[in-house]
Regions:
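Short solvent-exposed beta->alpha transition segments
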Residues: 35-36, 40, 51-111
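Short, low-complexity N-terminal intrinsically disordered segments enriched in polar/charged residues
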Residues: 3, 12, 19-49, 55
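Exposed beta-sheet edge and beta->alpha loop/turn motif
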Residues: 92-150
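Internal amphipathic alpha-helical segments of the cytochrome P450 catalytic fold
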Residues: 50-51, 141
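Short charge-dense sequence patches
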Residues: 22-28, 80-85, 130
Length: 150
């Protein structure tokens, strides 16, 4: 799938996502895991530790974006926006099929994907929407599989 198609699919999912707002505080630790993974990754990018951010990403991300290309691209984008002043998660939703309420395990399954939108204010009063997807890996950890800023 091309990057453009993937971003279009992510945008479509996010348009149907649920607002996070005050929900983040009432989420269980398991429900917060994808959001926590996205936030940790963003903090790493904010600190300009681009090699670490690339290493933290999902295998699908690393396979589609070579480390040097990621580093150069994210550095250029972040220089245009400046430092982060405030970031707030706005929406979160499943990509594809959500877990079934009657599933006795209630557990997230490998390959499950979550889309997250952040409303971010940068230095110089620039605002942007950061769109992310995180995927549950074989190791049981949530990792960033996609990132787009607009």
């Amino acid at each position: 799938m091309s990057l453009r198609r993937a971003l279009a699919a992510l945008a479509a999912v996010l348009s149907m996502a649920l607002p996070v707002g005050g929900q983040a505080q009432s989420m269980s630790p398991e429900q917060r895991q994808p959001l926590n993974a996205a936030e940790r990754w963003l903090v790493t990018v904010d600190a300009e530790r681009y090699a670490n951010a690339w290493a933290m990403a999902a295998e699908s991300f690393k396979a589609s974006v070579p480390q040097k290309e990621f580093r150069d691209g994210i550095r250029r984008i972040r220089q245009d926006y400046g430092r982060v002043v405030l970031r707030k998660s706005e929406k979160i939703g499943f990509v594809g099929e959500a877990p079934k309420p009657d599933d006795p395990t209630g557990a997230a399954k490998e390959g499950m994907q979550i889309a997250i939108l952040f409303d971010t204010k940068f230095a110089g009063s620039k605002r942007a929407t950061e769109e992310m997807s995180v995927v549950l890996g074989k190791d049981g950890l949530w990792r960033v599989a996609g990132y787009y800023i607009r």
